[in-house]
A protein has these predicted regions:
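Short, non-transmembrane alpha-helical segments in secretory-pathway proteins
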Residues: 24-69
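Active-site-adjacent substructure of cysteine-protease-like catalytic cores
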Residues: 58-82, 287-353
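Catalytic Cys-His active-site segments of thiol-dependent hydrolases/isopeptidases
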Residues: 89-90, 95-105, 347-367
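Active-site-adjacent structural segments surrounding the nucleophilic cysteine of cysteine proteases
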Residues: 94-274, 507
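Alpha-helical segments with a strong preference for the paired helices of cellulosomal dockerin domains
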Residues: 186, 511-552
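Short, compositionally biased P/S/T/A/G/V-rich stretches that sit at domain boundaries
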Residues: 375-423, 445, 507
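Solvent-exposed serine/threonine-rich low-complexity stretches and specific carbohydrate-binding patches
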Residues: 443-463, 468
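Short beta-strand elements
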Residues: 491-511
Length: 552
């Protein structure tokens, strides 16, 4: 949970009537038709995303009753047979499709708290329309239409409980939960793989559990130990299911979450941990993130200086630059929750990662209000949103390769081993990078490397492959070696491993083979290799001498 420092006010003309029926209300059957058309359109445009094809594939999960108009609903949520859901507004002057996901379900008995706040914001906006008495509203003009958008940047689906809470304070024999503010921060830090260390963080008093949270010592973070998912929600049995992970993997992600919580002075509790959203800014800067990062708000009575177009333009600018956004939605009556905005699409919907084990992560509108005054003035409504923009490391390089492909087969030491890094992408503040391929022994040491390859920040085509070759030393010791793809910025001695192969290069005597293990007793394989392309016929004595040479 994140707290707001002031109570949010609502517009005075809200909730003027609780009995009038507005002609703009949408029935459940009409909403089902809208949902069905939307799902069909998406299934045709992108097969395998939204899988429903008929009205019978939609199951009503929830109809949110209006609190200001009788016999009306603010929105409807439909689960899609085969996975996914879609949320439809109950007022025809609002944005029709408020949100959707192509996986999982939506269960209003197990709703992620950040999504609950987001939906409460939609509810208040829709009820504003339901009770609006003027006749001067017209559809808002479309000010932006994305051609491609940005696919979700965050791949993690982390949460707040086991095992993420393993290093949180204990109260009455229970771990306190991580808190949504810290969970969002931790996922963004994992995305950037930064920082790799933290200074000590002092103790503070936690009011919810009435005890001091002890100081934390300086530490390091090993992001290579962390994984994208530790648990997931089992919809069939309505329970959280643990994925496979090791104890070091769990402890490392728990440590990252704890340091994030300590940095914002998290008010810990086993039932729910909270912190002020704006405390994230100072915390991220204390971890070494850009000093130019900013905290901005929209939709509060004391600070409503951004139009929707301006707000969404800022979001897209961040995402186009590859910067996921620490975001928050606030409910005036219950505070709010932090989450992450990490993508947008051509329909002006934004991808939210709620930090709830992947539950209900999907595409949502930033506002349900789809109308403006006839004179062009935007409707002002106090549905508070907040975000941190410009959050990135001061100097960074993050490079990924989808796969490492290594030429298989037998070789003699001294030959060249060919390797390819496929679908290479990177984000960096450096103008150019150097990459190479290295042979790695069982202890993790780089034994030898290819020539370095220089790639330019602005000239390299993202998603391309990079090829190189390693000359196998004639003195290479027997054993098993993996092949790694490395990058470095300016100092070649500070190479960072991007990826290493699971298959091994086996070396026996003077013979090497990548892939399956082999023994030198497989004489026919050795002879076939040595004779390949040769017109000379070797006798038994000659072959024996040749093998003796290779072994010695």
């Amino acid at each position: 949970m994140n707290y707001t420092k002031n109570l949010l006010s609502t517009l005075a003309l809200l909730f003027m009537s609780t009995s009038a029926i507005n002609a703009g209300n949408i029935s459940v059957n009409a909403a089902r038709t809208v949902a069905n058309n939307f799902v069909k359109q998406h299934a045709a445009a992108a097969p395998g995303t939204l899988r429903g094809t008929a009205s019978s594939d939609l199951m009503l999960a929830h109809a949110e009753p209006s609190s200001v108009v009788t016999n009306a609903n603010d929105y409807y949520a439909f689960n899609i047979k085969g996975g996914g859901f879609v949320i439809i507004a109950g007022e025809d002057r609002a944005a029709q499709v408020l949100g959707y996901s192509d996986k999982g379900r939506i269960d209003f008995n197990n709703l992620p708290a950040p999504l609950e706040d987001l939906l409460n914001g939609y509810k208040k906006e829709i009820e504003f329309l339901q009770t609006y008495k003027g006749n001067d509203l017209v559809p808002a003009p479309v000010t932006f239409k994305a051609s491609n958008g940005v696919e979700p940047l965050i791949k993690t689906t982390w949460g707040q409980e086991d095992p993420y809470d393993w290093q949180c304070p204990v109260y009455q024999n229970q771990y306190c939960v991580v808190g949504c503010v810290a969970t969002a921060m931790a996922q963004v830090m994992y995305y950037w793989q930064y920082p790799t260390s933290s200074n000590a963080i002092g103790r503070y008093y936690c009011y919810s559990i009435r005890q001091y949270v002890p100081a934390l010592p300086a530490t390091t973070f090993d992001y290579s130990l962390m994984i994208d998912s530790y648990c997931h929600w089992d919809w069939d049995n309505s329970q959280l299911v643990q994925d496979f992970y090791t104890d070091p993997q769990a402890q490392e992600v728990a440590k990252l979450g704890r340091y994030c919580g300590q940095a914002v002075e998290m008010d810990y509790s086993p039932e729910g941990s909270g912190a002020y959203t704006d405390s994230q800014l100072a915390a991220m800067k204390s971890f070494g993130y850009s000093s130019s990062a900013q905290y901005v708000q929209k939709g509060y009575s004391w600070n409503n200086n951004y139009t929707t177009a301006q707000w969404e333009s800022m979001i897209r600018t961040e995402l186009d630059a590859g910067r996921p956004i620490l975001y928050a939605a606030n409910d005036p009556s219950a505070g709010g929750h932090a989450f992450i905005c990490d993508g947008y699409n051509s329909e002006n919907r934004y991808h939210f990662n709620f930090g709830w084990y992947g539950t209900c992560d999907g595409w949502y509108v930033s506002t349900a209000l789809n109308m403006t005054h006839r004179e062009g003035d935007e409707l002002k409504f106090n549905s508070g949103h907040e975000m941190l923009i410009g959050v990135e490391p001061p100097a960074y390089c993050i490079i990924n390769a989808e796969n490492l492909n290594v030429a298989s087969g037998l070789m003699v030491l001294g030959d060249q081993l060919s390797a390819e890094a496929q679908n290479v992408t990177f984000r960096t503040t450096y103008n150019q990078l150097n990459v190479d391929f290295s042979l790695i022994d069982a202890e993790g040491n780089q034994v030898c490397s290819s020539d370095n390859i220089t790639i330019g920040k602005n000239s390299f085509q993202q998603g391309s492959s990079i090829n190189g070759s390693i000359t196998l030393p004639t003195t290479l010791a027997e054993g098993s070696y993996s092949i790694g793809f490395y990058y470095y910025t300016t100092d070649a001695s500070k190479q960072t491993k991007v990826q290493a192969t699971q298959d091994k290069l086996q070396v026996v005597g003077h013979i090497a083979k990548y892939g399956e293990p082999f023994t030198i007793s497989d004489v026919s394989v050795v002879i076939d290799y040595l004779l390949q392309g040769s017109s000379d016929i070797l006798g038994i004595k000659d072959v024996t001498a040749l093998i003796d040479y290779l072994l010695n």
